[in-house]
């Protein structure tokens, strides 16, 4: 239980690293990526895994939190993931934090 609390407190720092990486993605030696990998390696030792979500994957409320919808005329895209705005994580197979996603909604 103490590990879970500590890890939850650390997730915003991982989010900040993700944001920094996205803003510096074209730099050759991005130190933020090294820091992120090191932090994820530590988390992995305690059973933390990133929830993998692919673009156009069907929305799954057991792993995702829909924070917004994107209207589309394509009915095949309805309820599929448009974008991941915040990564989700599991701890020993249980959701620690749901991934925040934008989901298509057919008009």
Where do the PLM segments sit?
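Charge-rich, N-proximal long alpha-helical rod segments
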Residues: 1-11
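Structured alpha/beta interaction-core segments
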Residues: 14-107
């Amino acid at each position: 239980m103490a590990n879970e609390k500590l890890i939850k407190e650390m997730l915003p720092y991982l989010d900040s690293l993700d944001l920094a990486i996205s803003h510096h993605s074209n730099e050759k030696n991005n130190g933020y990526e090294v820091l992120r990998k090191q932090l994820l390696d530590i988390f992995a030792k305690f059973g933390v895994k990133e929830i993998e979500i692919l673009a156009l994957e069907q929305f799954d409320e057991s792993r995702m939190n829909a924070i917004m919808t994107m209207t589309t005329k394509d009915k095949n895209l309805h309820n599929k993931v448009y974008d991941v705005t915040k990564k989700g994580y599991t701890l020993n197979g249980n959701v620690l934090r749901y991934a925040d996603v934008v989901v298509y909604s057919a008009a």
